[in-house]
């Protein structure tokens, strides 16, 4: 396995571990999720370039669109929660209440 793939998998693993360790704040969870999406995007782009399959070129672009939508929704949720509660602690939020 080439070194670039190992580095990207290491970046994904570190982001996943960060998501598990720093899950108390919503902002840190969103940053770790963005790191995971970025490493998946780079891996999909490299796989597409190596396979030379024309229809596979849409996969990285679709992942990038979903990552942008996820970031926009996550930041809107963060702003809404911080305006309502004054903090971004995940464990203090009970979103099932009216």
Swiss-Prot record:
It comes from the Eukaryota. Its EC number is 7.1.1.2. Pfam families: Oxidored_q2. Keywords: Electron transport, Membrane, Mitochondrion, Mitochondrion inner membrane, NAD, Respiratory chain, Translocase, Transmembrane, Transmembrane helix, Transport, Ubiquinone. InterPro entries: NADH_UbQ_OxRdtase_chain4L/K (IPR001133), NUOK/Mnh_C1-like (IPR039428). It is a multi-pass membrane protein. It catalyses: a ubiquinone + NADH + 5 H(+)(in) = a ubiquinol + NAD(+) + 4 H(+)(out). GO terms for biological process: ATP synthesis coupled electron transport. It is an enzyme of class 7 (translocase). Its main location: mitochondrion. The keyword Hydrolase does not apply. One of its GO terms (cellular component) is mitochondrial inner membrane. The chain crosses the membrane at residues 1-21, 29-49, 58-78. The keyword Electron transport applies. Core subunit of the mitochondrial membrane respiratory chain NADH dehydrogenase (Complex I) which catalyzes electron transfer from NADH through the respiratory chain, using ubiquinone as an electron acceptor. Part of the enzyme membrane arm which is embedded in the lipid bilayer and involved in proton translocation. Belongs to the complex I subunit 4L family. Core subunit of respiratory chain NADH dehydrogenase (Complex I) which is composed of 45 different subunits. This is NADH-ubiquinone oxidoreductase chain 4L. It comes from Gorilla gorilla gorilla (Western lowland gorilla). The gene is MT-ND4L.
